[in-house]
Amino acid sequence: INVPDLLIASHIIPWADSTAEQRLAPENGICLSALYDKAFDRGLITISPDDYTITLSSALLEYETKDYFDKHFGSIARNKIIMPIEHAPNRDYLAYHKERIFKGV
């Protein structure tokens, strides 16, 4: 999305679960639209710590037949995220999200 007002700096490890250092670490953040921020926070999508690809949860796949699914979620499944020039998302933090927050495949 190219509309800065619709982008959110999202924590990979949630604020409540983070140490003081993690809360301020740029590597504990990713830039997402409001829709994907909510999906990420709720564990409906995750980012692989191995190759930075997006995985959809089975809970989200229940909506695969809905009109909006392909446009908003099917189109991002298995895509690699656009990496920032500096402060790439920390692989350990992404692993935490995948293991503890993501609702699984």
Task: Name each region found by the language model.
Residues 1:
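Internal active-site segments that recognize and position negatively charged phosphoryl groups
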Residues 4-7, 12-105:
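A detector for short metal-coordination/catalytic motifs
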